[in-house]
Amino acid sequence: MSYPGYPPPAGGYPPGAPGGGAWGGAGYPPPTMPPIGLDNVANYAGQFNQDYLSGVAANMSGTFGGANVPNLYPGAPGGGYPPVPPGGFGQPPPAQQPVPSYGMYPPPGGNPTSGMPSYPPYPGAPVPGQPMLPPGQQPPGVYPGQPPMTYPGQSPVPPPGQQPVPSYPGYSGSGTVTPAVSPAQFGNRGTITDASGFDPLRDAEVLRKAMKGFGTDEQAIIDCLGSRSNKQRQQILLSFKTAYGKDLIKDLKSELSGNFEKTILALMKTPVLFDAYEIKEAIKGAGTDEACLIEILASRSNEHIRELNRVYKTEFKKTLEEAIRSDTSGHFQRLLISLSQGNRDESTNVDMTLVQRDVQELYAAGENRLGTDESKFNAILCSRSRAHLVAVFNEYQRMTGRDIEKSICREMSGDLEQGMLAVVKCLKNTPAFFAERLNKAMRGAGTKDRTLIRIMVSRSEIDLLDIRAEYKRLYGKSLYHDITGDTSGDYRKILLKICGGND
């Protein structure tokens, strides 16, 4: 069967890789990592083991982009928004910026339930099936201070305070549609940001005093490390060794214990290194934590996953793909290997001809046949861009009358079903996906502490504010409330510090 307008002419879908340069494409990784920018300890650098310094510098540069960051907001043609700046925790640089990744909400009206928690639309979104009100009659935006957003051919929007929440335009007919950008991408939506007036040497002294002598001042450690960004914590590590000739990590291990120790040590690793150790732990010994593997690989950006491959090989002397192959099998293994390539299309345009073709192929591979062609689901869900797949999910619902999640539940089972569902949920609404994971970690008898720690730490500088909002919306209680009731002692205190407040 053929479809009008497909395949697209040369230069169409998929888009070409971004050009080379210091921030992506053929030029990535750069021949030399940019400097870390630790000016305040530069005079002491000669005292360190140079292999140790270069390793830390490489990790930090890969994660945070180094100090020589180019202008983040160049002029955009046509008066549109400039590219979204890097957001930390492996977010891609401007030249490789994907479609809304963290903090992404689904199109207005969400999707029908499929036996799983329903992910609601953004506050202020129109009633499903109803057209958007014209500018000037829109409900107030939920992000005060956000600059007005305009698109080619659109009438001027109201000033801040009277501005609508951006929404996806209707997908009808063929052609190319550029989706709106999620408000959560404009600014940091994490609970932890760079501390103002930061002095790593002073913080090193505070930590030294907290662990010196008889007993440990756990509250001082919580107040210090729980309110510094990951980049700042890496500087504290260097300053501590400079000032005292001791390894801060070893001192923390000797003074702390239990889940409190695990949380503090998680905060001290760079985001990519933390993920590498979480994956290593997930496949170690008897049994595999499949949910951990799919959570990490389904939710991280392309650049973060590429850096994760490099760090994993350096730390454990085997590739990430080799580790996955050694501990998984079948279609679930293929799904993980596909995601571990960090090669998802990052285009922001949507070709509706290709969308309709993918919908037809997904339907033919599942609901419209005896048995399931899992490889077709894998190929489409792991390679297409986020914007394209959101359009596919909407069109699938329109054309088949069934939500894509419900079809996956009907056609698959076991780890593959859970893996495919995780990919779809991350694409639709990343904060809601993590809210559901947190709720499951604390629900019922016992707490899945590793999951709780991993999500709280890894999302603390990205979208934990959005996760908190989704948690309250889905479960009627605040995340802060449930953490308080499910944990205790210093472990509870550090998690609540990361949580950042009650809703």
Curated annotation (Swiss-Prot):
One of its GO terms (molecular function) is calcium-dependent phospholipid binding. SUPFAM superfamilies: Annexin (SSF47874). Keywords: Acetylation, Annexin, Calcium, Calcium/phospholipid-binding, Cell cycle, Cell division, Cytoplasm, Cytoskeleton, Nucleus, Repeat. InterPro entries: Annexin, Annexin_repeat, Annexin_repeat_CS, Annexin_sf, ANX11. Gene3D superfamilies: Annexin. GO terms for biological process: cytokinetic process; phagocytosis. PROSITE patterns: ANNEXIN_1 (PS00223), ANNEXIN_2 (PS51897). Expressed in a wide variety of tissues. It is found in: Cytoplasm; Melanosome; Nucleus envelope; Nucleus, Nucleoplasm. The keyword Zinc-finger does not apply. Coiled coil: none annotated. Annexin repeats lie at residues 198-269, 270-341, 353-425, 429-500. Its main location: cytoplasm. The modification N6-acetyllysine is found at K246, K253, K477. Residues 80-97, 118-167 have a biased composition (Pro residues). Residues 80-197 are annotated as: Disordered. One of its GO terms (cellular component) is nuclear envelope. Interacts with PDCD6 in a calcium-dependent manner. Interacts with KIF23 during cytokinesis. Isoform 1 but not isoform 2 interacts with S100A6. A pair of annexin repeats may form one binding site for calcium and phospholipid. Binds specifically to calcyclin in a calcium-dependent manner. Required for midbody formation and completion of the terminal phase of cytokinesis. Belongs to the annexin family. This is Annexin A11. The gene is ANXA11.
